[in-house]
Regions:
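Sec-dependent N-terminal signal peptides
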Residues: 4-13
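N-terminal signal peptide c-region/cleavage motif recognized by signal peptidases
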Residues: 14-18
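Soluble non-cytosolic domains of exported or imported proteins
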Residues: 20-25, 52-63, 106, 125-128, ...
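...with weaker cross-activation on analogous glycine-rich loops/strands in unrelated enzymes
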Residues: 22-27, 85-164
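Extracytoplasmic/secreted envelope proteins and their assembly/folding machinery
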Residues: 23-27, 31, 62, 66, ...
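Sec-exported extracytoplasmic/periplasmic mature domains
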Residues: 31, 35, 66-74, 81, ...
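Acidic helix-start/capping segments at beta-turn-to-alpha-helix junctions
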Residues: 42-62, 75-99
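Low-complexity, Gly/Ser/Thr/Pro-rich intrinsically disordered linker/tail segments
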Residues: 159-188
Length: 188
């Protein structure tokens, strides 16, 4: 019995360490896009499926998240498409589509918000201690424009986590966590 309890404790500790390692790897993979993804281009593009991408030198905020997860063999293009097919009624109908579109669905913040609400842990929007490196955060910018980013391992001198995102000038690591209206905070 004691051996079993020790084994369970070791497993829980190992899984916690693995999650932290994956979170830091996600941050590092997002940072790899800084000074590489230098533009912002929201144009609709045909792309491969699965694992399709726009050219690495450009993209939008969602592409930062998608690319970082791909380095961990997590294909949000495929996962969002599968989940939308399974739970079409759960996803927003903001674009007038009647079915899924593998070229764009995963590149839309409201779709990623829905996916993370369904499959990730939702966390506090106000408790500063709840924001950990690798967490995903979504906002609404002025004119209700959706935005998404990844919490960095770096913080401001005041202790506020920086965010890795692309808001128009390529992938950046910046102090924007509380600059806009926060909508979602997820750990996946």
């Amino acid at each position: 019995m004691k051996k079993w309890i020790v084994s369970v404790i070791l497993l829980v500790v190992s899984l916690g360490t693995l999650a932290a390692t994956n979170a830091m790897q996600l941050v590092n993979d997002a940072k790899k896009q800084i000074n590489v993804t230098i533009g912002y281009d929201p144009a609709y593009r045909k792309m491969a499926f699965p694992m399709g991408d726009v050219p690495l030198h450009t993209g939008v905020c969602t592409d930062v998240v998608i690319r970082a997860y791909r380095h961990q063999q997590i294909d949000l293009q495929k996962l969002v498409n599968q989940d939308m097919k399974k739970a079409w009624s759960s996803y927003p109908k903001l674009w007038g589509l009647k079915s899924t579109d593998t070229n764009i669905d995963h590149r839309r913040v409201p779709n990623l918000e829905t996916f993370f609400q369904r499959h990730a842990k939702s966390l506090s929007l106000t408790d500063i201690t709840s924001f950990k490196a690798g967490d995903i955060v979504t906002w609404r910018l002025p004119r209700n424009l959706p935005h998404i980013g990844i919490i960095s391992d770096k913080k401001t001198p005041a202790g506020i986590p920086l965010v890795i995102h692309n808001i128009g000038a390529g992938t950046q690591e910046e102090d924007i966590l509380f600059k806009y209206k926060m909508i979602g905070h997820y750990r996946y």
